Swiss-Prot record:
Name the record gives this protein: Transcriptional repressor NrdR
Domain of life: Bacteria
InterPro entries, alphabetized: ATP-cone_dom, NrdR-like_N, RNR_NrdR-like
Note describing how the cofactor binds: Binds 1 zinc ion.
Gene designation: nrdR
Lineage, opening ranks: Bacteria, Pseudomonadati, Pseudomonadota, Gammaproteobacteria, Lysobacterales
Membrane-spanning segments: none
Similarity section: Belongs to the NrdR family.
GO biological process terms held by the UniProt record: negative regulation of DNA-templated transcription
Amino acid sequence: MHCPFCQHSDTRVIDSRVSEDGTTIRRRRECEACGERFSTLETIELKLPTVVKSDGGREAFDARKLRTSFDRALQKRPVAEEQIEAAVRSVVHQLRMSGEREVGSLRVGEYVMVELRKLDHVGYVRFASVYRSFQDVADFREEIEKLERELPVGSEQLPLLEVALERAGKPGKR
């Protein structure tokens, strides 16, 4: 690293300390030529792919938007914060491991749907209704029936269509 005082190219590290959260390292350096001391901060750079939107626009991946998608789909659902965080980490990990510089928003949506399907079927259908632009009740019914056909026997989650139909008949249960 070049010295910021004399621009000499040889500096040595005289002390290193890891931050409390473990995400940065503070290094105290000394210039071999002029003897001046200075500090540097070293952080991890994790490059995530750029998201290509359906209209062709490109934007940097934003983990907050991803978290918001999960929060909206799972609003008022019995899913623990830790489970949601793990699902977000899983999607981010899949994107990072893809090794691609760009990824389509449709692929990100598919990753989200896989995670939601594991967490909560109602949240999954909520997300799918927006992601796949459901037009009417038949689209919901088709997705729910498809989901129920693919469920393993003895699944812990309630059968969606039965719950939806039962609630539809009771006022105030929306």
